[in-house]
Amino acid sequence: MMTMWCLTLFVLWMLRVVGMHVLRYGYTGIFDDTSHMTLTVVGIFDGQHFFTYHVNSSDKASSRANGTISWMANVSAAYPTYLDGERAKGDLIFNQTEQNLLELEIALGYRSQSVLTWTHECNTTENGSFVAGYEGFGWDGETLMELKDNLTLWTGPNYEISWLKQNKTYIDGKIKNISEGDTTIQRNYLKGNCTQWSVIYSGFQTPVTHPVVKGGVRNQNDNRAEAFCTSYGFFPGEINITFIHYGNKAPDDSEPQCNPLLPTFDGTFHQGCYVAIFCNQNYTCRVTHGNWTVEIPISVTSPDDSSSGEVPDHPTANKRYNTMTISSVLLALLLCALLFAFLHYFTTLKQYLRNLAFAWRYRKVRSS
């Protein structure tokens, strides 16, 4: 037991040292009210949404596969058939998903919406070694079956949920009917193709850089002002800047205005937003970049308060200000006294020297 614990700690330490990449694909098939099916595939690498495939059964010819981040242009340049291959793969998966949706809707019944999800994920080290994998299928937001841990055994859902419990026989039968060969194919994919592409993506990927955020108040006039919030140096360029007032988003009549998203010379981006607000109110600027969020408090005082020379909520600063004022007055009085004394002394000395010179001349005249 102790040996396994030490081995687990060692593996976790190694992952921390060498780093780890996570490549995940999520497939979502949906039947709408008109029995048309849509399939959307989303690729995420290290938290960056890099790929999307979409098709609708009403127009299969319009299926499209697109890179959704700047470094995917380099992947497409290095592998010219990449997007065509992903589109062809998506078209095949669409046909399988349509059949599975029909089967599940008949077996499990129509609920709030007929939604089939499928996720697979592989975790690799920086040097391309496979660490862990995952395969899972879900229906209407609940997991039906999963392949994880050592990737040899499929497990079922949480049967405490009533509608899953009602269909336990069907679900257990589906899991039991998964052949060892099918499981091997999934395992080999996660350890092979998925891991290989994770290494390829890591060579083209631009690392995530979260922004430096600054907020404050400007253009203050009477009882109105602008609260601004600017984010610098972030990548990728997808960012959300909102203003929160008393725990809620800014009201509709004061929606924030955002400047265009602009690139910088180092490949990152910056963007600023502002909102018109009343004075004597507290706002919070909330910036979300991927799974990273920061909040900057912004307080606005009225011009009357700011012109009084007082610093709100800082009595120590007020006391320091008063002390400095008194010291300045005393110093000025002392300098005036010294200047007066010097002028008085200089005038007296000048008069004394003049009298002394006159007496010397008078003595010299009498002696002659």
Curated annotation (Swiss-Prot):
Signal peptide start and end residues: 1-19
Subcellular location: Host membrane
Keyword DNA damage: no
InterPro entries per record: Ig-like_dom_sf (IPR036179), Ig-like_fold (IPR013783), MHC_class-I_related (IPR050208), MHC_I-like_Ag-recog (IPR011161), MHC_I-like_Ag-recog_sf (IPR037055), MHC_I/II-like_Ag-recog (IPR011162)
Keywords: Glycoprotein, Host membrane, Host-virus interaction, Immunity, Membrane, MHC I, Modulation of host NK-cell activity by virus, Signal, Transmembrane, Transmembrane helix, Viral immunoevasion
GO cellular component: host cell membrane; MHC class I protein complex
Cross-referenced Pfam families: MHC_I (PF00129)
Membrane topology: Single-pass membrane protein
GO biological process: antigen processing and presentation of peptide antigen via MHC class I; symbiont-mediated perturbation of host natural killer cell mediated immune response
Transmembrane region(s): 326-346
Record flagged with keyword Signal: yes
Function: Plays a role in the protection against host NK cell cytotoxicity by interacting with and modulating the activity of the host inhibitory leukocyte Ig-like receptor 1/LILRB1, which is expressed on monocytes, dendritic cells, as well as subsets of T and NK cells. UL18 exerts an inhibitory effect on LIR-1+ NK cells, while it stimulates LIR-1- NK cell.
Complex formation: Interacts with host LILRB1.
Name assigned to this protein: Membrane glycoprotein UL18
